[in-house]
Regions:
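Hydrophobic positions in the central parallel beta-sheet of the AAA+
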Residues: 13-15, 35, 70
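Walker A/P-loop phosphate-binding motif and the immediately C-terminal alpha-helix
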Residues: 2, 16, 38
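Active-site phosphate/ATP/adenylate-binding loop shared across adenylate-forming ligases
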Residues: 1-9
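Switch II (G3) loop of P-loop NTPases
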Residues: 10-22
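Short, well-ordered alpha-helical microsegments
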Residues: 21-24, 79-80
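Acidic, Mg2+-coordinating active-site environments of NTP-dependent enzymes
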Residues: 7-8, 37-177
Length: 177
């Protein structure tokens, strides 16, 4: 599909790369401009995936070695090890610690036709963001998306509009009764 995307004029793509995909060498030969490490926990441990957490972390970190810029969640408890395994430039984001990009003044918002959160991006980038899906993990996800968007010089109003109108079918849909 990559060749078809190029033929049809696609300049950028976002791709989820799993630890299993890395372990099975599915992305060998691909150098990524940006790689994002959101978090890691004891998922994917078992006979069909990874033998133990150390193996899982090892393979997750392999993605960042393939990236020009590694975007890493500063709040993840394995941050130091992740950064030791990162490739070239490391950019950090956080809700709780000093980082290149930080989410501050986080508020949960409940309005007619909107349930979500509002926060300020501070650090290397200044922006007020409203995201229409609640939950702390969505602050992390939205902040990580802002980090990537900042590298592409996208207009801030487009970033804000996209996050405020984000829609995933079946996720936090408002049902009027």
């Amino acid at each position: 599909y990559f060749a078809q995307m190029v033929e049809e004029g696609c300049e950028y793509m976002v791709m989820e790369v799993s630890s299993q995909g890395l372990k099975m060498h599915r992305v060998d030969g691909i150098d990524f401009d940006y790689g994002m490490f959101t978090n890691i926990s004891n998922d994917h441990i078992g006979p069909n995936e990874h033998a133990d957490f150390a193996e899982y972390l090892y393979w997750k970190c392999q993605l960042l070695k393939k990236c020009r810029v590694a975007i890493v969640n500063r709040d993840d408890e394995h941050f130091e090890e992740i950064c030791r395994n990162a490739g070239r430039e490391v950019v950090t984001y956080s809700l709780e610690q000093d980082a290149n990009f930080m989410a501050k003044d986080i508020h949960y918002v409940s309005e007619p036709d909107f349930v979500g959160l509002d926060f300020d991006v501070t650090g290397q980038y200044q922006l007020n963001v409203k995201v229409n899906i609640p939950g702390k993990f969505n602050v992390y996800n939205a902040l990580a998306a802002v980090v990537v968007c900042s590298y592409f010089d996208l207009p801030k109003d487009r970033i804000c509009h996209a996050l405020e109108h984000l829609y995933v079918n079946g996720r936090m849909e408002i049902v009027h009764t």
